[in-house]
């Protein structure tokens, strides 16, 4: 067992709950037979105490004690997505 707290970075895909959001974590894995790299997505429920993040925001989250049946991650740093060129 490690003593380090796990931190991950992902994109907010849902913020319709009070003090909660769903964050999609993407990772790249290699197919065991064909060797092609495949993108896999994991959705995690995250505690957002101040409701400060919206859909599309890139956030940093860390693991914590279980807060509910599905929530055991909390928001560390809310980061905004990079500005798109030509979009206001």
UniProtKB/Swiss-Prot annotation:
Superkingdom: Bacteria
UniProt GO molecular function: rRNA binding; structural constituent of ribosome
InterPro entries: NA-bd_OB-fold, Ribosomal_uS17, Ribosomal_uS17_bact/chlr, Ribosomal_uS17_CS
UniProt keyword terms in alphabetical order: Ribonucleoprotein, Ribosomal protein, RNA-binding, rRNA-binding
SUPFAM superfamilies cross-referenced by the UniProt entry: Nucleic acid-binding proteins
Pfam family, any one: Ribosomal_S17
Disulfide bonds: none
Entry keyword Transcription: no
A GO cellular component entry from the record: cytosolic small ribosomal subunit
One GO process term, biological-process aspect: translation
NCBIfam families referenced in this protein's UniProt entry, alphabetically: PRK05610.1 (NF004123), uS17_bact (TIGR03635)
Record text on subunit structure and interactions: Part of the 30S ribosomal subunit.
Function description: One of the primary rRNA binding proteins, it binds specifically to the 5'-end of 16S ribosomal RNA.
Family: Belongs to the universal ribosomal protein uS17 family.
Name the record gives this protein: Small ribosomal subunit protein uS17
The organism of origin for this protein: Yersinia pseudotuberculosis serotype O:1b (strain IP 31758)
Name of the gene: rpsQ
């Amino acid at each position: 067992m490690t003593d380090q707290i796990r931190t991950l970075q992902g994109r907010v895909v849902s913020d319709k709950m009070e003090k909660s959001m769903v964050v999609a974590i993407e990772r790249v894995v290699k197919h065991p037979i064909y060797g092609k790299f495949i993108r896999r997505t994991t959705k995690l429920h995250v505690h957002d105490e101040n409701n400060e993040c919206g859909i599309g925001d890139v956030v940093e989250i860390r693991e914590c004690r279980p807060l509910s049946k599905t929530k055991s991650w909390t928001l560390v740093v809310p980061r905004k997505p990079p500005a798109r060129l030509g979009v206001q």
